[in-house]
Amino acid sequence: MANSLVEKYSNEIAPAMNKKFNYDSVMEIPKIDKIVLNMGVGDAVSNAKNLDEAVEELTLISGQKPLITKAKKSIANFRLREGMSIGAKVTLRGDRMYDFLYKLINVSLPRVRDFRGISSRSFDGRGNYTLGIKEQLIFPEIDYDKVNRVRGLDVVIVTTAKTDEEARELLTEFGMPFAK
């Protein structure tokens, strides 16, 4: 799977991008740098078991052990202390990144209820794309019967593109289903 996306990039996407945007050097052609999956577990403050379940689910989804994120500062209203574990994140690069991207585009996103495409307005101005997923059940690795709480996660696709237009073109070429 990953190899097919890598081949598609080098054989089709990179030449098409170079033709469209007229780059001076082949090193200027945008590519996907990394994909970061982040799952914030706010209720981990009251129940640490929830964080363990989120870590397990993120491991199944990404194929790699997540890093547990900690609170940067205390917030009394949320009963939160500095240094408490409140989430998990995974940074995917290389083959695992392309495997995840393939799975996201071809398997997971089509499983979303009432799916009409993803928003093309979620670019950050520097060529990175952020996608919020409301429930982890769209991933085939997650067993519906073993889930006791529906959690969402953020997927950030970091590219080397300088502008949003270039990044949108790159992700469209990869097959990202943007809403018309």
From Swiss-Prot:
One cellular-component annotation, GO: ribosome
Gene Ontology molecular function: rRNA binding; structural constituent of ribosome; tRNA binding
Entry-linked Pfam families: Ribosomal_L5, Ribosomal_L5_C
GO biological processes: translation
InterPro entries: Ribosomal_uL5 (IPR002132), Ribosomal_uL5_bac-type (IPR020930), Ribosomal_uL5_C (IPR031309), Ribosomal_uL5_CS (IPR020929), Ribosomal_uL5_dom_sf (IPR022803), Ribosomal_uL5_N (IPR031310)
Transmembrane residue ranges: none
Alphabetically ordered keywords of this record: Ribonucleoprotein, Ribosomal protein, RNA-binding, rRNA-binding, tRNA-binding
Entry function: This is one of the proteins that bind and probably mediate the attachment of the 5S RNA into the large ribosomal subunit, where it forms part of the central protuberance. In the 70S ribosome it contacts protein S13 of the 30S subunit (bridge B1b), connecting the 2 subunits; this bridge is implicated in subunit movement. Contacts the P site tRNA; the 5S rRNA and some of its associated proteins might help stabilize positioning of ribosome-bound tRNAs.
Protein family according to the UniProt entry: Belongs to the universal ribosomal protein uL5 family.
Subunit description: Part of the 50S ribosomal subunit; part of the 5S rRNA/L5/L18/L25 subcomplex. Contacts the 5S rRNA and the P site tRNA. Forms a bridge to the 30S subunit in the 70S ribosome.
Protein name: Large ribosomal subunit protein uL5
